[in-house]
């Protein structure tokens, strides 16, 4: 059975929050990631954000 764990009350992080992620794939527009501290929900980091 898969365990589910959340570290924060909110379902999603706020803008400008720093979170731990696992990169799932890299595409032309950016990277698809799993947000480790938010029950592994999927997110996307745009390429323009990665280059900052």
Swiss-Prot record:
The keyword rRNA-binding does not apply. Transmembrane segments: none annotated. GO terms for molecular function: GTP binding; ribosome binding; RNA binding; translation initiation factor activity. Keywords: Cytoplasm, Initiation factor, Mitochondrion, Phosphoprotein, Protein biosynthesis, RNA-binding, Translation regulation. This results in the global attenuation of 5' cap-dependent protein synthesis and concomitant translation of ISR-specific mRNAs that contain a short upstream open reading frame (uORF) in their 5' UTR, such as ATF4, ATF5, DDIT3/CHOP and PPP1R15A/GADD34. Residues 16-52 form the S1 motif domain. It comes from the Eukaryota. The modification Phosphoserine is found at residues 48, 51. PROSITE patterns: S1 (PS50126). Phosphorylation at Ser-48 and Ser-51 stabilizes the eIF-2/GDP/eIF2B complex and prevents GDP/GTP exchange reaction, thus impairing the recycling of eIF-2 between successive rounds of initiation and leading to global inhibition of translation, while concomitantly initiating the preferential translation of integrated stress response (ISR)-specific mRNAs. Substrate for at least 4 kinases: EIF2AK1/HRI, EIF2AK2/PKR, EIF2AK3/PERK and EIF2AK4/GCN2. Phosphorylation on Ser-51 by the EIF2AK4/GCN2 protein kinase occurs in response to amino acid starvation and UV irradiation. PANTHER family: EUKARYOTIC TRANSLATION INITIATION FACTOR 2 SUBUNIT 1. Belongs to the eIF-2-alpha family. This is Eukaryotic translation initiation factor 2 subunit 1. It comes from Oryctolagus cuniculus (Rabbit). The gene is EIF2S1.
């Amino acid at each position: 059975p898969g365990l589910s764990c959340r570290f924060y009350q909110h379902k999603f992080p706020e803008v400008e929050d720093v979170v731990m992620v696992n990169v799932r794939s890299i595409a032309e527009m950016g990277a698809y990631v799993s947000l480790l501290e938010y029950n592994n929900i999927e997110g996307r980091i745009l390429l323009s954000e990665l280059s900052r």
